[in-house]
């Protein structure tokens, strides 16, 4: 089926398969495309096509990811599948593949394993909001009680990390049997996708979120005032809107947008993705700087201390050659600027090796507009040594 035929009229959702190595994530991905292809909603992909995922170099880090797309009756999906565990860690922390929901694949023959736990924790930390469970390899388990036991274990594990374990849909199936065309098991794939359709909500569009624009540059126009330029990250801004200037200062300043300009043309409004200049009333040139954000009043606050999930680049990826310890003071690059911060490691962690991922507490020397889920990179003298995502705000 030609790519051109895909209808873009359906709502779009990004999902991915997560779970322990060899529990069947890639086989399930292949099975979904193969089963949906029969209804004309996908291009069937074999296991080998997905498993030979190309390595992508996202900002200097090598991540192997397979991207497939398919559709159900109600939605269009982009689906990511990573062959290696390290690929997931990098993918989820850098946001290279945003997920609106995940399909957690657990082998019924083995039950939850270490990476099952790690992927659930990562999903929690990086803000994957919804998880649906596919208990795989059920054709290999004859004992109904054993299946129920594994299901209970998975539900408990999800609850432990703050997901609604009791309410999450769990589908029992066999990806391999479905891939081989056995009708009973194909039906389980259809059931899985029906649950994904129903349980994972359509994400809010970027334009519907509260306005936010990182300030990239500032200049003054004689007789008109101060202009802040940048790319609108989310939401919509209209002439006459009251916005706040947030970050790098003790207090947020409030101002009115008196003009919006894009490619030297004046606009009434701008939206997510637009590169604009915003003319700000009563703001002096020195009152605003790169690294601050313009945002809808009250929508976001500046914070200096937070917990983050961090992935440290290995030496081969251009990162550090040596470990770092508590009280390490690198720069944290948020959106458009570097801010120095100091690191506290969790109890029992003496040091962090290149290539590790770790949860840490970071205290910046100046507050920055951040929220749970805000991405950042860690730099030393302009060289990136790690990536992170804000997990929880401390103060």
Swiss-Prot record:
InterPro entries: EF-Tu_GTP-bd, EF-Tu_GTPase, EFTu-like_2, EFTU_2, G_TR_CS, P-loop_NTPase, Small_GTP-bd, T_Tr_GTP-bd_dom. Residues 81-84 are annotated as: G3. Residues 19-26 are annotated as: G1. Mg(2+) binds at residue 26. It holds the Pfam family GTP_EFTU. It is found in: Cytoplasm. CDD domains: EF_Tu, EFTU_II, EFTU_III. Residues 10-204 form the tr-type G domain. It is an enzyme of class 3 (hydrolase). Residues 136-139 are annotated as: G4. Residues 60-64 are annotated as: G2. It catalyses: GTP + H2O = GDP + phosphate + H(+). One of its GO terms (molecular function) is GTP binding. Residues 174-176 are annotated as: G5. The keyword Chaperone does not apply. Its main location: cytoplasm. Its EC number is 3.6.5.3. GTP binds at residues 19-26, 81-85, 136-139. Keywords: Cytoplasm, Elongation factor, GTP-binding, Hydrolase, Magnesium, Metal-binding, Nucleotide-binding, Protein biosynthesis. The keyword DNA repair does not apply. One of its GO terms (cellular component) is cytosol. GTP hydrolase that promotes the GTP-dependent binding of aminoacyl-tRNA to the A-site of ribosomes during protein biosynthesis. Monomer. Belongs to the TRAFAC class translation factor GTPase superfamily. Classic translation factor GTPase family. EF-Tu/EF-1A subfamily. This is Elongation factor Tu. It comes from Bacillus cereus (strain AH187). The gene is tuf.
């Amino acid at each position: 089926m030609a790519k051109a035929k895909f209808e873009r009229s359906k709502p779009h959702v990004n999902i991915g398969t997560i779970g322990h190595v060899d529990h069947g994530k890639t086989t399930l991905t292949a099975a979904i495309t193969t089963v949906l292809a029969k209804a004309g909603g996908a291009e069937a992909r074999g296991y080998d096509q997905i498993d030979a995922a190309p390595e992508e170099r996202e900002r200097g880090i090598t991540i192997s990811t397979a991207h497939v797309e398919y559709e159900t009756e109600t939605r269009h999906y982009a689906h990511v599948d990573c062959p290696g565990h390290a690929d997931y860690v990098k993918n989820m922390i850098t946001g290279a593949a945003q997920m609106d929901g995940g399909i957690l694949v657990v082998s019924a023959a083995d039950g939850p394993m270490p990476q099952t736990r790690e992927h659930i924790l990562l999903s929690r930390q990086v803000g994957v909001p919804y998880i649906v469970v596919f208990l795989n390899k059920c054709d290999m388990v004859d004992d109904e009680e054993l299946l129920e036991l594994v299901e209970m274990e998975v539900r408990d594990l999800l609850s432990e990390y703050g997901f609604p374990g009791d309410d999450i849909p769990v589908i029992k199936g066999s990806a391999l049997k479905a891939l081989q065309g056995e009708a009973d098991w194909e039906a389980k794939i259809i059931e899985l996708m029906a649950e994904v359709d129903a349980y994972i909500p359509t994400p809010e569009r970027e334009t519907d979120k509260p306005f936010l624009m990182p300030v990239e540059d500032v200049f003054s126009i004689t007789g008109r005032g101060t202009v802040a330029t940048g790319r609108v990250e989310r939401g919509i801004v209209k002439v006459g809107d009251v916005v706040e200037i947030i970050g790098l200062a003790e207090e947020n300043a409030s101002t009115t947008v008196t003009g919006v300009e894009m490619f030297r043309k004046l606009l009434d409004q701008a939206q997510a993705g637009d590169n604009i200049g915003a003319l700000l009333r009563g703001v002096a040139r020195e009152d605003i700087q790169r690294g601050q954000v313009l945002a809808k009043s009250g929508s976001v606050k500046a914070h200096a201390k937070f917990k983050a999930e961090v992935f440290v680049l290995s030496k081969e990826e251009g990162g550090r050659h040596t470990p770092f310890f508590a009280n390490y003071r690198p720069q944290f690059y948020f959106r458009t600027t570097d801010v120095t911060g100091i690191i506290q490691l969790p109890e029992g962690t003496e040091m962090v090796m290149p290539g590790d991922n770790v949860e840490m507490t970071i205290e910046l020397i100046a507050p920055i507009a951040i929220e749970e889920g805000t991405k950042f990179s860690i730099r030393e003298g302009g060289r990136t040594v790690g990536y992170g995502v804000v997990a929880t705000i401390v103060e």
